[in-house]
């Protein structure tokens, strides 16, 4: 470019006079401007190319969007068509089902109407026939009467002519009547058949789908059908019946036509308006019901019309009336032509007859009606099919649209696109703002004054700035335009979706045959969105680059530092903005999964919380249900036990009654033998009377007294300890010769207090009984037994006779001869026994089957009855209620209260004096007397085995200090007894104690606890206080309460108080409440393991116990406590522990099972620092596990007779047939007069079963103390030694025992029933050895005979045990007996020290275990040393004197300690030299301790039947918690089965780990049933015919069969047992419990 060339911008060239710097600057500006122009042009070319490319891209996008739209439309159309087809198909099926239902209903209506029509036709026909015959008969009679034949002068010709004419008339009449009637009936039958065929053809045509025929129904047919039939009878005022019948049929056919036309209307309407099909169909369905009702109503109205029409007024009108049945237009017999009938049905001449073939019955041809019917059916089927298809298609489309939910997804996509569009719009606006700011900055930079700048340069800068601003605005508008296009595409897609979702259109039918399309693909929308976003971002980057490149245009030569700084700041800001945007996107991407994870975690947390709450609630409910089930099971088992014992007692009583009757018969025979010589007695009467007078005149003889006993002075009664017997003169004479025998018997009875079999009574013969003393049934049985006892007493005693008599008495129940034994044990008969019973059920004697209910007492459940004497042969007691009423009481409705035996409460004045002989006015004295006697017996110490026999109130008064005070208390006791208070619970010596006793806490957890108590009265409620705040009120009769919602680790104080009514509060009751404290656990207990399984190991004699470990958290805790391991229990006894929180199995060897044959189930508990969990679900031990262990063969019963003072008896014990019955100590009545066989008598007493009821005389023999001294005391010690030997033998255990034997607490027994378990070895397992060291020598032959007889004896049923107040009361009572036994050991000492030394000598191959405080002279051996090894190397044997010989005083009581941890002195003792004197014990084992700690903090203790020292730091003293009420010792643990620690407490504190418990009391206290071995007493055949069909599944028994019994007795009195390999039901009343001397 030349210097003088004009400037492109119109600027003039520089003048020569200008300075060169300005020209240079201007030149530079021009060059820069040219450069900028070139760049601008290049940029514009690039922009144009970019625009073209964008336009092509836009067209491509539009085409793709159009294609996608078409695809979306095709998919929507195909889906809509598929949905419509499905909905139409469903609608068609529904319509078809409705149609079938309508057809079935129509068929039922038609059949019903046809049956009605047939019945009407038959009745009409019968009536018409009868009427026609009657008319014929009347006509014949009239013709005969009025004819010539009836005249006297008529000839035979005229008569014959009359008869011929009569026959012709009758024939014509018969032809007219019968012919027309028969034709009419045939016609109606044919009409019915045709109508049935038409209807069937109509139905078949609907199902077969015949081709359509042209034709339309006549709308006037409906009106013509609804018109009534015209009266067509020509000579009658009544409408003919066949016309009415025909009208009903025609109306029915007309209704069918209406139905067909309605359906035809539906088919015609289907083509015009498919939407109205449903309403039309509904109307068509509804139009049939009223028509059918009208037809039925018309049919029902026919009989009424017929009755009204059959009333002929006279014989003249009968002939026309007989022709009413024939149609008037036709007199001929055949049916009328169809035209006539059509006139009848349609008088207007057949309008619409071609289109409605069903309007008439048979006038139209069958072909035409069938054709039209097929046509109508086809039209209906077609319309129905179209409608069903349409409805089904619509329904499917609607379901698909609702199920797909695409509109909602599309809406969400649209919302997201809108949000992104808003963001892009904001970004574009921000870019525009920034461009505007840059433009302003450039303008300010350009407008800055530059020295030497010309006006042309300024204008050029302005123009460039404006151009730059336009370019920037165009660049900003490009993304906005793209956004608008995207928005338009979105709107089009949304509109398309809205049109598709709005419903199908008519134009969519054209695309029915096209390809199947789908909904708008969400991926395509996402792809378009991503592409648009990428495009916008690319434009933004280009804009930013252009801004960066074009920022230097307004500057001249880069001299403006401000523009460069601004550009750098802008670039930095843009980069920072992009970086922040990317970070935001990344954070948003990361936030979405995090948000989803948070929502999922929250959802899982809520679900876990809900599940936890549900599980807690379910656990609580199941726990409550389990507690309730356990309680119900316990109650049921107790009731079953009572019922079983009652049934056994009833059966045994029946046998005893038969035996008593036999004895009575024998006694009567003997009395008759004594009275066989009355004449001789009369002759000898006078000399005998003189002899009696002479004897009475002797000095010192008591004066003669009348037969009735006179009242003795009270001072004389006080001076005597034994009731005196005043005999009658006659009896005195008879008894005088036998006085020597009587004195001998009394001396022998005093010398030996153990009476074992025979009675030694005073000879007495009561031959005369005054008539003024009526005897009850009980008194008669007593007199019989006493008379027979006197007969036995008069016979001289000899060894043979005594043996026979003993065997006879042994066959009977001991209580059956209790009265005879009482009279035989003293000079006078003892008073009847007073026992207290409680009524178990309500009983009204007048509702029973007895013949004399007036002599029985009505009973109410819970009442106390005072029983005198024993049960009679009918099973009744003589009793008295609290209100003084006396009478007979049925034994099966009452149950005896424990320790309620009261010795004779009446003065013994006559051998026949019974309770029934007392006057009614002496009731109060009797009650007071019984209470005083009860107090006297309550004063007797249980451990001293003494019983004070009280004869009268004055004798008791000598033993009591303050009689007046006690008399007042007795009066109050009587009044309280009448108010429902239990006399045994009223207190000792009249102390009125109403406070609940034996409070015990059980099931103590962190938040709950259960308290139980024993109430003094079941008629008053109790208030439970928690921390001296009233917590709850329990109703009367409830003795337990459960605390809920307690705080963990908190000390609580519970007080239970009885709430009495206001009238009883006036009496001073002493204490009315009891208090107990407890602490809740800190946490826990842990949950028990699951899925416990017991399997046999591959090795013999090994069991594998597996379980599912409890779920623990990361800290190893379950339910908040640390899990330390698991403990395995077998039937409640711990056998092993596993010190691993995750252990799942363990192995049990046969040597670990102490009494394996008794075990049935194994449970596992979870151990923790806060105790053990509840038992898991028990697992059954395999039955074949014990079969693999064969015990060595045992020889039969044998004995050895060695030293004269000692002998050994060996009893074989069968592992499968050992006794399960709990034998108890008892002393059978025995005649000590025969001194030649004491050992045989000992064996008899040794093996006898416990009696059901123990009489005071038998108690006198076994535990009472005779009034005599000297030889009597020695005999008593000897008897106690023998008794101890017998009991210790019976209570030994062996590994073969099914169950450890136990002792049942018999009423009235005060014998110490505490047993010790030995730990000595035995040379031969399976044998029980008895080594006696006391008693005189017996001849071998007598020993053998006695032993054989003992083995032959059949065992009686298990003794009746009265209801126990609680399991732990028995244990507490036995524990108290142990404590008293120590005191008793100070007073008792067997003769000689030689036997003591012999007792200390060890047996070869065995070690003798000696129990603490033993007072028996026998050695006990037990084959269980392999299972229970000796715990210490040094055996410290207990001397006979008890602990007082070891340094403790006689009055030092034993205390109970519990071991806090395991202790082995050989390993853990600090002084190894003294370790031999220390005992080995295990954790939670109970120890008996005497005295206090020594200087080394050691106690003197007894453990495992060894005495030694124990460290005081490892034991803690237990509060036994017994209290003495009513001379009974009770434990707080009443009402539940105690834990192992409590059981060990009350079992004598000698049970180490690995040994079984010697449970005392009834076997029903055991939680699980074990098999029992019983013996059949009688034969039983279930198939003898008496059982009927009930004998199936029962076993046949023979007397002596041994039966294995499984489980308790059922409701019908049967056991489930096994005999000879067969299992079934056996009757419980025919089974006896076996003892050791059984089979």
UniProtKB/Swiss-Prot annotation:
The keyword Repeat applies. GO terms for cellular component: cytoplasm; cytoskeleton; nucleus. Residues 1-22, 215-240, 295-364, 697-811, 1251-1273, 1292-1325, 1392-1413 are annotated as: Disordered. One of its GO terms (molecular function) is benzodiazepine receptor binding. It comes from the Eukaryota. Residues 832-899, 1452-1520, 1569-1636 form the SH3 domain. Residues 776-790 have a biased composition (Low complexity). It is found in: Cytoplasm, Cytoskeleton. Residues 326-339 have a biased composition (Pro residues). GO terms for biological process: fertilization; spermatid development. Residues 21-143, 409-442, 480-619 form a coiled coil. Residues 707-718, 761-775, 1293-1305 have a biased composition (Polar residues). The keyword Transferase does not apply. Keywords: Coiled coil, Cytoplasm, Cytoskeleton, Differentiation, Repeat, SH3 domain, Spermatogenesis. Residues 1392-1406 have a biased composition (Basic and acidic residues). PANTHER family: RIM BINDING PROTEIN-RELATED, RIMS-BINDING PROTEIN 3A-RELATED. Probable component of the manchette, a microtubule-based structure which plays a key role in sperm head morphogenesis during late stages of sperm development. Belongs to the RIMBP family. Interacts with LRGUK (via guanylate kinase-like domain). Interacts (via C-terminus) with HOOK1 (via coiled-coil region). May interact with FASLG. This is RIMS-binding protein 3C. It comes from Homo sapiens. The lineage of its organism: Eukaryota, Metazoa, Chordata, Craniata, Vertebrata.
């Amino acid at each position: 470019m030349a210097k003088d060339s004009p400037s492109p911008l119109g600027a003039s060239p520089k003048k020569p006079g200008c300075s060169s710097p300005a020209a240079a600057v201007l030149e530079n500006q021009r060059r820069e401007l040219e450069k900028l122009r070139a760049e601008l042009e290049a940029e514009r070319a690039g922009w144009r190319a970019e625009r073209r490319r964008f336009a092509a891209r836009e067209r491509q996008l539009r085409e793709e969007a159009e294609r996608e739209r078409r695809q979306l439309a095709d998919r929507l159309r195909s889906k809509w068509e598929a949905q419509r087809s499905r909905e139409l198909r469903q609608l068609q099926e529904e319509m078809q089902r409705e149609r079938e239902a309508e057809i079935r209903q129509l068929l039922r209506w038609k059949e019903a109407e046809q049956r009605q029509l047939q019945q009407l036709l038959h009745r009409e026909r019968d009536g018409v026939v009868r009427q026609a015959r009657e008319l014929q008969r009347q006509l014949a009679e009239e013709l005969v009467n009025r004819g010539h034949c009836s005249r006297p002068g008529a000839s035979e010709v005229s008569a014959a002519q009359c008869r011929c004419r009569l026959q012709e008339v009758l024939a014509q009449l018969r032809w007219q009547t019968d012919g027309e009637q028969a034709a009419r009936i045939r016609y109606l039958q044919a009409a019915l058949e045709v109508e049935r065929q038409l209807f069937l053809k109509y139905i078949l045509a609907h199902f077969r789908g015949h081709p359509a025929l042209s034709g339309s129904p006549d709308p006037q047919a409906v009106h013509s059908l609804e018109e009534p039939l015209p009266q067509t009878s020509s000579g009658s005022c009544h409408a003919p019946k066949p016309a009415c019948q025909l009208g009903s049929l025609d109306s029915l056919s007309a209704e069918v036509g209406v139905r067909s036309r309605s359906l035809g209307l539906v088919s015609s309407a289907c083509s015009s308006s498919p939407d109205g099909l449903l309403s039309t169909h509904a109307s068509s369905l509804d139009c049939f019901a009223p028509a059918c009702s009208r037809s039925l109503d018309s049919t029902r109205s026919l009989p009424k019309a017929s009755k009204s029409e059959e009333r002929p007024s006279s014989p003249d009108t009968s002939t026309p009336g007989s022709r009413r049945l024939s149609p008037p237009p036709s007199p001929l017999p055949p049916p009328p032509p169809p035209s006539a009938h059509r006139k009848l049905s349609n008088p207007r001449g057949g309008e619409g007859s071609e289109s409605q073939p069903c309007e008439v019955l048979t006038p139209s041809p069958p072909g035409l009606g069938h054709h039209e019917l097929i046509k109508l059916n086809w039209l209906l089927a077609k319309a129905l099919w179209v409608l069903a298809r349409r409805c089904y298609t619509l329904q499917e489309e609607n379901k698909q649209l609702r199920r797909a939910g695409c509109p909602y997804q599309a809406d969400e996509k649209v919302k997201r696109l809108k949000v992104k569009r808003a963001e892009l719009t904001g970004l574009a606006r921000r870019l525009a703002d920034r461009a505007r700011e840059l433009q302003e900055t450039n303008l300010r930079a350009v407008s800055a004054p530059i020295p030497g700048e010309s006006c042309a340069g300024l204008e050029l800068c302005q123009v460039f700035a404006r151009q730059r601003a336009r370019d920037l605005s165009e660049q900003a508008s490009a993304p906005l335009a793209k956004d608008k296009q995207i928005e338009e595409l979105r709107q089009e897609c949304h509109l398309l979706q809205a049109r598709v979702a709005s419903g199908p259109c008519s134009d969519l039918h054209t695309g029915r045959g096209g390809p199947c399309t789908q909904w708008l693909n969400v991926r395509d929308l996402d792809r378009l969105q991503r592409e648009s976003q990428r495009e916008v971002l690319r434009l933004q980057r280009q804009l930013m680059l252009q801004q960066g490149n074009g920022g230097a245009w307004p500057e001249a030569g880069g001299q403006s530092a401000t523009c460069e700084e601004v550009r750098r700041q802008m670039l930095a800001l843009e980069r920072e903005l992009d970086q922040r945007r990317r970070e935001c996107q990344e954070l948003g991407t990361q936030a979405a999964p995090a948000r989803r994870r948070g929502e999922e975690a929250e959802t899982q947390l809520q679900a876990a919380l809900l599940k936890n709450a549900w599980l807690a609630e379910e656990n609580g409910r199941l726990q409550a249900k389990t507690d309730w089930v356990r309680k119900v099971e316990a109650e049921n088992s107790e009731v079953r036990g009572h019922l079983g014992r009652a049934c056994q007692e009833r059966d045994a009583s029946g046998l005893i009654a038969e035996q008593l009757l036999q004895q009575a018969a024998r006694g009567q025979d003997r009395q008759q033998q004594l009275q066989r010589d009355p004449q001789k007695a009369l002759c000898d009467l006078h000399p005998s009377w003189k002899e009696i007078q002479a004897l009475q005149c002797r000095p010192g003889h008591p004066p003669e007294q009348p037969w009735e006993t006179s009242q003795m002075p009270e001072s004389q009664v006080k001076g005597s300890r034994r009731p005196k017997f005043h005999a009658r003169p006659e009896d005195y004479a008879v008894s005088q010769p036998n006085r020597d025998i009587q004195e001998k018997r009394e001396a022998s009875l005093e010398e030996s207090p153990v009476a074992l079999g025979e009675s030694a009574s005073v000879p007495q013969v009561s031959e005369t009984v005054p008539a003024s003393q009526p005897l009850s049934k009980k008194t008669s049985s007593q007199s019989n037994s006493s008379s027979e006892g006197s007969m036995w007493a008069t016979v001289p005693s000899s060894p043979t006779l005594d043996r026979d008599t003993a065997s006879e008495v042994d066959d009977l129940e001991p209580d059956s001869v209790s009265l005879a034994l009482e009279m035989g044990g003293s000079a006078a008969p003892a008073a009847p026994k007073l026992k207290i019973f409680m009524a178990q059920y309500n009983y009204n004697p007048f509702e029973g089957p007895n013949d004399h209910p007036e002599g029985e007492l009505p009973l109410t459940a819970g009442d106390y009855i005072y029983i005198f004497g024993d049960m009679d042969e009918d099973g009744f007691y003589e009793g008295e209620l609290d209100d003084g009423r006396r009478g007979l009481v049925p034994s099966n409705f009452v149950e005896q209260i424990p320790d309620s035996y009261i010795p004779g409460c009446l003065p013994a004045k006559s051998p026949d004096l019974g309770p029934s002989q007392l006057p009614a006015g002496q009731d109060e004295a009797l009650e007071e007397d019984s209470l005083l006697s009860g107090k006297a017996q309550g004063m007797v110490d249980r451990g001293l085995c003494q019983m004070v026999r009280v004869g009268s109130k004055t004798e008791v008064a000598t033993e009591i200090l303050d009689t007046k005070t006690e008399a007042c208390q007795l009066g109050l006791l009587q009044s309280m007894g009448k108010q429902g208070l239990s006399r045994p619970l009223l207190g000792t010596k009249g102390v009125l104690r109403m406070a609940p006793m034996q409070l015990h806490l059980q099931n103590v957890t962190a938040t709950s606890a259960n308290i139980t108590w024993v109430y003094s009265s079941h008629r008053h409620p109790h208030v439970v206080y928690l921390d001296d705040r009233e917590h709850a009120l329990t109703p009367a009769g409830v003795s337990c309460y459960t605390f809920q919602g307690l705080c963990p680790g908190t000390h609580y104080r519970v007080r239970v108080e009885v709430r009495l009514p206001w009238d009883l509060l006036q009496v001073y009751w002493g204490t009315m409440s009891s208090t107990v404290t407890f602490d809740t656990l800190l946490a826990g207990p842990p949950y028990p393991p699951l899925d416990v399984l017991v399997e046999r190991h591959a090795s013999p004699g090994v069991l594998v116990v597996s379980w599912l470990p409890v779920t623990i958290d990361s800290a190893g805790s379950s339910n908040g406590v640390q899990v330390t391991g698991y403990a395995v229990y077998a039937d409640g006894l711990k056998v092993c522990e596993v010190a691993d929180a995750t252990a799942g199995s363990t192995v049990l060897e046969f040597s670990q099972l102490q009494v394996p044959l008794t075990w049935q189930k194994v449970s596992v508990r979870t151990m923790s620092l806060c105790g053990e969990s509840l038992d898991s679900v028990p697992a059954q031990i395999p039955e074949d596990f014990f079969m693999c262990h064969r015990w060595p063969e045992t020889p039969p019963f044998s004995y050895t007779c060695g030293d004269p003072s000692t002998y050994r008896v060996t009893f074989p014990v069968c592992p499968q047939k050992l006794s399960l019955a709990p034998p108890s100590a008892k002393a059978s009545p025995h005649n000590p007069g025969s001194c030649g066989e004491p050992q045989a008598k000992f064996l008899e007493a040794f093996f006898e079963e416990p009696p059901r009821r123990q009489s005071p005389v038998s108690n006198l023999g076994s535990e009472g103390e005779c009034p005599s001294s000297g030889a009597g005391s020695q005999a008593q010690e000897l008897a106690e030694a023998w008794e101890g030997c017998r009991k210790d033998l019976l209570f030994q255990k062996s590994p073969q025992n099914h169950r450890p034997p136990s002792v049942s607490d018999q009423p009235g027994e005060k014998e110490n029933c505490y047993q010790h378990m030995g730990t000595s070895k035995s040379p031969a397992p399976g044998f029980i050895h008895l080594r006696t060291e006391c008693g005189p020598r017996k001849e071998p032959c007598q020993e053998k005979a006695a032993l054989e007889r003992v083995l032959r004896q059949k065992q009686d049923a298990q003794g009746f045990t009265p209801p126990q107040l609680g399991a732990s009361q028995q244990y507490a009572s036995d524990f108290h007996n142990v404590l008293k036994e120590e005191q008793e050991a100070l007073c008792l000492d067997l003769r000689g020290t030689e036997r003591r030394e012999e007792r200390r000598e060890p047996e070869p191959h065995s070690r003798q275990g000696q129990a603490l405080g033993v007072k028996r002279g026998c050695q006990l051996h037990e084959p269980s040393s392999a299972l229970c090894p000796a715990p210490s190397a040094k055996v410290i044997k207990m001397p006979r004197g008890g602990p007082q010989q070891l340094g403790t005083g006689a009055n030092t009581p034993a205390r109970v300690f519990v071991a806090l941890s395991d202790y082995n002195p050989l390993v853990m003792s600090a002084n190894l030299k003294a370790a031999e004197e220390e005992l080995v014990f295990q954790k939670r084992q109970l120890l008996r301790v005497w005295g206090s700690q020594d200087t080394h903090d050691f106690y003197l203790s007894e453990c495992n039947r060894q005495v030694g020292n124990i460290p005081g730091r490892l034991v803690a003293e237990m509060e036994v918690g017994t209290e003495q009420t009513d001379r009974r010792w009770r434990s707080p643990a009443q009402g539940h089965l105690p834990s192992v620690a409590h059981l060990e407490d009350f079992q004598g504190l000698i049970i180490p780990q690995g040994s079984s418990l010697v449970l005392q009391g009834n076997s029903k206290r055991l939680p699980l049933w074990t098999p029992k071995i019983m013996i059949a007493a009688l034969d039983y055949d279930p198939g003898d015919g008496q059982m009927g069909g009930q004998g199936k599944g029962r076993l046949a028994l023979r007397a002596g069969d041994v039966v294995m019994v499984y489980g308790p007795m059922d409701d019908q009195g049967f056991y489930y047992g096994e005999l000879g390999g067969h299992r079934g039901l056996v009757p419980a009343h025919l089974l006896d419990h076996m003892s050791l001397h059984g089979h």
